[in-house]
Amino acid sequence: MSKSVHYLFDVDGTLTKPREKMDSSFTMSFLEWIVGKSVFLVSGSDMKKIKQQIPHSIISRCSGISCSMGNELWLGKELKYKNTFEPPKTLIEMLSSFQVKTKSPVLGKAPFIEYRTGMINFTTIGRDSSNEQRLAYYNWDKDHKERVRVLDQIEKTFPDLEAKLGGQISIDIQPKGRNKSQASKWVRKNLSGKIIFFGDKCTPEGNDYDIYVDVKKNGGESYSVKSPLDTLKLLERN
């Protein structure tokens, strides 16, 4: 099949369950599908976490991997670009205050703030929370909207930054415009062909929203999925 189509995939919630390894049956199906295709992974996570979730057999077949909200791009072993970000001390103090004051009944383990290339990731319950704790917090947060309130306050206080919901428990924070749409813009600028994007956090507060909109506005296709199974069903049509 021609590589005039470029497929861009979010990872958590799209190719895998949040922070889990790719399911073996999904891996087999994806390996059959990926043959002859141009595929990019676009994640809020860093490369280390992506490699923990996605098998090498798939990573090695990808045309590129965009990490940390598009702030780092790898083509094979070649680093194409890497952005930097030094968060204001007042932002770190604000996040620490949010963590101390959380009303969440679920409390996991530190770190609460994780520094990544060109961004930081924040969670009130701790990144080393178990899968059970993550799910419990996610269900609680759907009703109480803690993360939405936090990201709204961040953007009001720091107008040059943007904050987006990431995964089940966290918020991705980066300079305005340095979101996942950096990946689709790079592909469009440097490669010819149509772009098709798949992601699960495609509402305005989600970390897939900007790339979802960018692809659709520029002649591509964007799909909002609810699970890896949902993604597989769509791939059967592509």
Predicted regions and their residues:
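Mg2+-dependent phosphoryl-transfer enzymes with acidic/Ser/Thr/Gly-rich catalytic loops
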Residues: 2-3, 23, 174-238
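Short glycine-/acidic-enriched loop or helix-start segments at secondary-structure transitions
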Residues: 18-19, 50-53, 76-77, 132, ...
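Substrate-recognition element of Asp-dependent hydrolases with the DxDx(T/V) motif
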Residues: 31-53, 65, 112-124, 165-167, ...
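Glycine-rich beta-strand-to-loop/alpha-helix junction loops that act as flexible
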Residues: 11, 69, 198-201
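Short, hydrophobic/glycine-enriched beta-strand segments
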Residues: 5-11, 41
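Conserved acidic, metal-coordinating active-site core of Asp-based
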Residues: 106-196, 204
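Active-site phosphate-binding/coordination module
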Residues: 20-112
